[in-house]
């Protein structure tokens, strides 16, 4: 029997389980029929989708607040992508462009980029700012999720 991977719906926040061999194929939420995000990928949600994830997702949500013009932010992108693949089913990783979503940056009191915030059950579980090594970042994320 194949292993199941948990995925939170961007539409309703419901937790769905996808068979490992079905990852990458089109899947829809069992509750609201919204297409599900592919597990193991960094998501770029809308403000509304992020609000749903923060409030309703059963999985912790790691938010990367970044800017396209920030070199340390770009340096962290492959590290985040690797983390999303490794922690698929245990952690959702999302990316928020602070220039495109200034209201979100303000709501989260983002003062520098990159800033990483882990949300669990609608509450902030931790935050850190600045680029770091893949090992340090993975240890930090694991300690909070």
Question: Which residues does each predicted region cover?
Answer:
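Short linker/helix segments within small regulatory modules
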Residues: 18-27
């Amino acid at each position: 029997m194949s292993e199941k991977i948990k995925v939170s719906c961007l539409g309703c926040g419901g937790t769905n389980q996808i068979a490992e061999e079905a990852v990458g194929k089109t899947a829809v939420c069992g509750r609201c029929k919204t297409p599900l995000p592919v597990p193991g990928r960094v998501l770029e949600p809308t403000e509304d989708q992020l609000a749903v994830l923060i409030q309703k997702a059963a999985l912790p949500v790691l938010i990367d607040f970044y800017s396209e013009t920030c070199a340390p932010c770009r340096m962290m992108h492959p590290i985040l992508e690797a983390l999303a693949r490794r922690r698929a089913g245990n952690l959702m990783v999302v990316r928020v462009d602070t220039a495109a979503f200034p209201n979100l940056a303000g709501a989260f009191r983002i003062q520098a980029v990159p800033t990483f915030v882990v949300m669990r059950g609608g509450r902030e579980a931790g935050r850190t700012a600045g680029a770091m090594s893949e090992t340090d970042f993975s240890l930090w994320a694991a300690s909070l999720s």
